[in-house]
Amino acid sequence: MSRPVPAVFGSVFHAQMPVIAYKDGKWQPTEWQTSADLTLAPGAHALHYGSECFEGLKAFRQADGKIVLFRPTANIARMQQSADILHLPRPETEAYLNALIELVKRAADEIPDAPAALYLRPTLIGTDPVIGK
């Protein structure tokens, strides 16, 4: 079955997104939310200090139909390094990887045939509503 490739890169988003909140000094369980606009407090750290980092990786459909992620552990390590540099909470490897894998499973029918791919953009943002924190 041939799967179409979206006409404009970055213009189509999956219906759901994983959200892993950091509260009371620890990461919370992954929640799946409808992909929608985000709401941030006017004092959100990301808005005043740019405390945000992101990564990018791809999921490819192989000739046999199997879907593979390209170097997810390297992606996670880069995100953790960026979090350390920005003094943001360091994402937990297992939860991050499980969220990526689950997202790819949920989006499997949307992954185009090679050489195209599903592009994932994990993002970490400082949402504390205190400018001086």
Map each language-model feature to its residues:
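Conserved alpha/beta cores of soluble small-molecule-handling proteins
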Residues: M1-K133
